[in-house]
Amino acid sequence: MAAPPLLSLSQRLLFLSLSLPKPQLAPNPSSFSPTRAASTAPPPPEGAGPAAPSRGDRFLGTQLAAEAAARVLAPEDAERRRRRREKRKALARKPSAAACYGCGAPLQTADEAAPGYVHPATYDLKKRHHQLRTVLCGRCKLLSHGHMITAVGGHGGYPGGKQFVSADQLRDKLSYLRHEKALIIKLVDIVDFNGSFLARVRDFAGANPIILVITKVDLLPRDTDLNCIGDWVVEAVVKKKLNVLSVHLTSSKSLVGVTGVISEIQQEKKGRDVYILGSANVGKSAFISAMLRTMAYKDPVAAAAQKYKPIQSAVPGTTLGPIQIEAFLGGGKLYDTPGVHLHHRQAAVIHADDLPSLAPQSRLRARCFPANDTDVGLSGNSLFWGGLVRIDVVKALPRTRLTFYGPKKLKINMVPTTEADEFYEREVGVTLTPPAGKEKAEGWVGLQGVRELQIKYEESDRPACDIAISGLGWVAVEPLGVPSSNPDESAEEEDNESGELHLRVHVPKPVEIFVRPPLPVGKAASQWYRYQELTEEEEELRPKWHY
């Protein structure tokens, strides 16, 4: 049996001091008083004699209590550690390498066909002089000269670009924003409001404040009242339960509303970086150019930044990575971010060569079917919107009218529904474009997505609703329900289930169809549009809109 280890003198004394009870001092007999003794007597010990806890016992009890508390709090500590790890991982995704100032792609000299390619000699020269932030990659040079070079793969069966940027990948790229102190500017295209309204934006922004900017209001039909548009947008935002600081109606082309956005950015920025977010081709790069052009009059930093601004193009996926722009004199940077490519938009299914046909270049003009009251009714007919949309009117009131708002390059054709299938097979790629050309039509996926719509006519003096086609435009359903003087028509209207419209809408399979309240466009809209009646408290909570 091994002998117990010998303790040093100091260890013995420490052990004895912890084990022995603390000696009590005897009271001074000369100053003893029974009353004073009763008031100053120490509290009775927990035990008497050998049962009294020693200092060692109290120390052990304290340690055991601390360990028990640690076990109770361990899950919370583990959760905090997990959040810290996620934050570090997300912040590590923040781009730090040199990137093309036109598209944000990391500069590289290996693959000439990939985004971000720069000739090795140019790269070495710019790197030697610390000028890599002034380099434009080969793809952006071609885009700036009008070439349609996509970097985004399609969903419609056509070969896409070399680098496909999906929504999930972009969410991963921008995940660090949740942990940054930033001001978020979210852009939405008014022509494609539902299709370009980026869902789950809080996945990017976290708790950072958001300013909502509506772009391309200059494309709305002439004589449109922007007061009605602003109220309609705010009502839609409230229904989507997105909390924003304010709503701005803007046009990057005419600079309408841009000054108001800049003023609010300067007020809310407070030294933070500013990020421009939005789906692909809502006009982020054009909006940044308009901002820099407006700010250049008073801010020399913004004036200098105009020389190296992001490339603008009709191609989805022009911007491939966050682009840092030195735009503010008072601190903080401006970032143009990649557009989120949504699979449910028309741009995801058509060929890159056909993309310009989806972008309106001038004010939208209403195209009505039937054009007037003397024309044949819609029941039993099918309307083709280019080769991308087919609307079968199964049942409608005699005075129902469908009004199309979208790109002028897409023609509208009406044929009897019984002949619609044969007409589409014969004319797709010829009369019905996009897809343009028989070669593209052979690889076309067709109109496989079908949605049945039952629309009730609520009032006869205003449109019943809009049918919005994601990535294209919208169709206003207008029941011209003026009482008819023809008794046969009146009887037919009464038999038609008290004013119900039955439509069958065909689109490419991934494309979404939205039924929404009618967008108040045109001169007559200010007469039929009704503003929401709100209490003072509701009015205070609603975001304000500006233009």
Swiss-Prot record:
Listed InterPro entries: G_CP_dom, GTP-bd, NOA1, NOA1/YqeH-like_C, P-loop_NTPase
Highest taxon listed in the record's lineage: Eukaryota
GO molecular function, one term: GTP binding
UniProt EC number: 1.14.13.39
Signal peptide (residue range): none
Start and end residues of each CP-type G domain: 167-343
Catalytically driven reaction(s): 2 L-arginine + 3 NADPH + 4 O2 + H(+) = 2 L-citrulline + 2 nitric oxide + 3 NADP(+) + 4 H2O
Region (Disordered): 24-57, 72-91
Record keywords, A-Z: NADP, Oxidoreductase
UniProt family annotation: Belongs to the TRAFAC class YlqF/YawG GTPase family. NOA1 subfamily.
Function, as annotated: Produces nitric oxide (NO) which is a messenger molecule involved in hormonal signaling and defense responses in plant.
Name of the molecule in the record: Putative nitric oxide synthase
